[in-house]
Regions:
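Structural alpha/beta surface segment adjacent to cysteine/selenocysteine redox centers
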Residues: 69-72, 77-157
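Extracellular/periplasmic catalytic domains that process cell-envelope and extracellular macromolecules
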Residues: 59, 92-94, 124, 190-193
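Residues at or immediately flanking beta-strands
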Residues: 6, 64, 96-98, 197
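Conserved strand-loop elements at the edges of beta-sheets that form or border functional pockets
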Residues: 58, 67, 81, 207
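C-terminal cap of thioredoxin/glutaredoxin-like
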Residues: 2-37, 70, 84, 154-224
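Short extracytoplasmic/periplasmic juxtamembrane "stem" segments immediately C-terminal to an N-terminal membrane anchor
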Residues: 33-51
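A short beta-strand-turn-helix
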Residues: 45-63
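Immediate post-signal-peptide N-terminus of mature secreted/exported proteins
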Residues: 62, 66-70
Length: 224
């Protein structure tokens, strides 16, 4: 199963707790300050070239797998707790697959998690991502923004980041806007409608068992 991206999802940037954050229009839970609306930019107006692709494996591997996932998606957490381990051991670590992880933002909590994961740079990104998915029920659980941020900071500190680093990353308004625009570009280009979704050598796949995933990879390796 995969989590569907709501059709009403729109990248709105708002001031909350001193930072600029992503929210959605669903249910109208959040009022958007006028200043934030004035500052909003469309994806076409934001230069996304500064966003680093998070990659594992051999850059010259015969197969490229791009995963689209949301940190608040239970199905994504399940994939990373199970099938991803097999994918990494059998295909990524053996040089058969170049794995690219791209974030999808259903809500502001997912954006905050992304900013914490990226705060550690390429070297720490996948380790922090693992911690975020493992602790998903804990940090998402309350649904209260202050508690969510507090739990994400705990994860960042567990990964070796200090409070100054975390504060700087979480308060980076330009980075938040750029990440949202980058996500929109990716989702539009690859026609992403839910998570987790996988683009395997340019072909979209979703709702797969590990056996199906493995069969696709082995077939492509046989053709390589």
């Amino acid at each position: 199963m995969k989590r569907m991206i709501p059709a009403a999802l729109l990248a709105l940037v708002l001031i909350a707790g001193g930072g600029w954050w992503l929210t959605t229009q669903l249910g109208g839970q959040t009022d958007i300050p006028a200043g934030a609306l004035d500052a909003q930019e469309s994806a076409e107006e934001v230069d996304t070239s500064s966003i680093v692709e998070m990659v594992q494996g051999d850059a010259d591997a015969p197969i490229t797998v791009v995963e689209y996932a949301s940190y608040t998606c239970p199905h994504c957490a399940n994939f990373h707790a199970n099938q991803y381990k097999d994918l990494k051991a059998e295909y990524i670590d053996t040089g058969k697959v170049k794995f690219v992880f791209r974030e999808v933002y259903f809500d502001r909590f997912g954006l905050w998690a992304s900013m914490v994961a990226r705060c550690g740079g390429q070297e720490r990104f996948f380790g922090i991502t693992d911690l975020i998915f493992k602790g998903q029920q804990t940090w998402v659980g309350s649904g209260q923004p202050g508690e969510v941020v507090g739990e994400l900071r705990k994860i960042g500190r567990l990964a070796g980041l200090n409070d100054d680093q975390l504060e700087s990353c979480l308060q980076d308004a330009n980075k938040a806007q750029t990440l949202v625009a980058w996500y929109e570009e990716n989702a539009d280009a690859d026609k992403i409608t839910g998570t987790p979704s996988f683009v395997i050598d340019g072909e979209m796949h979703s709702n797969m068992s590990w056996a199906d995933f493995k069969e696709i990879l082995d077939e492509k390796l046989g053709d390589a």
